[in-house]
Swiss-Prot record:
Leucine amide modifications at: 8
Naturally occurring in which organism (per UniProt): Periplaneta americana
Protein name per Swiss-Prot or TrEMBL: Pyrokinin-3
Superkingdom of origin: Eukaryota
Keyword terms: Amidation, Neuropeptide, Secreted
GO biological process per UniProt: neuropeptide signaling pathway
Length: 8
């Protein structure tokens, strides 16, 4: 899990 959500 990452603290951010990359915009793909």
């Amino acid at each position: 899990l990452v603290p951010f959500r990359p915009r793909l």
